[in-house]
Regions:
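A polyanion-binding, active-site-adjacent surface
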Residues: 2-254
Length: 254
C-alpha cells in the first residue's frame, strides 16, 4: 500500500497524529509473508469457543497472579483488550496510572494517539488485540524489573499462542527489548522486520505513543514504521496460504 492509496479515514488519522503525508520513494516490493507451515494454525483466529474459554482462563490467572511484588501495589491487573480474530497484536511496556484504574491498556492521551496510529494502517482499536509486557503497574511508573518481566512473560507468550497474529507491533524500547530478548537501541530496531518464536511471527518496532506526545518531531519516523506495518499486512493478505516459505519483508529506511 502506498500513500496514494490511503483512504480518507487514514489521511484524517495521520492529521490527528500530526504527520504530513508525502509520496514514498520507489522501493523494491515486499516479498511474501506467510505463516510458517510447520506450525499448526492456532484456533484463536477461528473465533472458536475453545479459544475464547482458554483466553478467559488465562485472564483469570492474570487477575489473581501474586508471583511478584507488583500485586501488592496494583489496583487491578490489566490483561489486555481486543478480539480473538485480531491479525495485529500491539504490545506495550506496562500499565500506567489510568490503565491501573480502568483495567484496560492504552487509555488516556497515549491511548488516543495509539488509536490514530491504528486508524492510519486501516485498523480500529476493536479490530486488534492490545497487551503489555507487564500486566501490573510498576509504582511511580518506574521501568519494569527483570524479575517482574520473568514472571509476566509467560502470560504474554500464552496470549500470542492463542491469537497467532499475522503481525506484532511493539511500541517502545522496553517492550521491544523484553519481547525480542535484545538490548539494541530502539533506533536500530526500527525500519526492519524481526520475527518472534518458532512460528516466526513478523514484528515491527516503533516509538511508544507517550514518547511521541513528548517528542512530536519523531512522528514522521513513526509514520515510516506504520508504512512498514502496511507492507507486511499487505503482503500477508495477498499471499497467505500459498506456500510455506519463511516470511521475509524488505527493510525500510528508518
Amino acid at each position: 500500500m502506498t500513500e496514494g492509496f490511503l483512504s480518507v479515514r487514514q489521511h484524517l488519522a495521520l492529521q490527528e497524529m500530526g504527520v504530513d503525508v508525502w509520496v514514498r520513494r520507489p522501493h523494491e516490493p515486499a516479498t511474501r509473508v506467510t505463516r510458517d507451515s510447520r506450525v499448526p494454525h492456532a484456533e484463536g483466529n477461528s473465533g472458536s469457543a475453545n479459544s475464547a474459554d482458554a483466553l478467559l482462563a488465562l485472564n483469570k490467572q492474570i487477575l489473581t497472579c501474586t508471583a511478584c511484588e507488583l500485586h501488592k501495589t496494583r489496583t487491578q491487573a490489566v490483561c489486555g483488550v481486543g478480539t480473538l480474530s485480531a491479525d495485529v497484536l500491539v504490545i506495550g511496556e506496562a500499565p500506567g496510572a489510568d490503565e491501573d484504574k480502568q483495567g484496560e491498556p492504552f487509555v488516556g492521551r497515549a491511548g488516543q494517539l495509539l488509536n490514530e496510529m491504528l486508524r492510519a494502517v486501516g485498523r480500529s482499536r476493536e479490530q486488534v488485540f492490545i497487551a503489555n509486557i507487564l500486566k501490573c503497574r510498576p509504582p511511580q511508573n518506574r521501568d519494569p524489573r527483570s524479575e517482574e518481566v520473568e514472571q509476566c512473560l509467560p502470560f504474554l507468550r500464552a496470549q500470542i499462542e492463542l491469537l497467532q497474529p499475522r503481525l506484532i507491533v511493539v511500541v517502545g524500547r522496553i517492550a521491544a527489548h523484553n519481547l525480542l530478548g535484545v538490548e539494541t537501541p530502539l533506533g536500530q530496531l526500527r525500519g526492519r522486520v524481526h520475527y518472534f518464536g518458532d512460528s516466526r511471527i513478523p514484528v515491527v518496532v516503533t516509538y511508544h505513543p507517550a514518547y511521541l506526545l513528548r517528542s512530536p518531531a519523531q512522528k514522521s519516523k513513526s509514520w515510516q514504521d506504520l508504512l512498514l506495518v502496511m507492507d507486511v499486512l499487505s503482503a500477508a493478505n495477498t499471499t497467505d496460504g500459498q506456500d510455506g516459505r519463511d516470511p521475509k519483508v524488505h527493510e525500510r529506511q528508518a
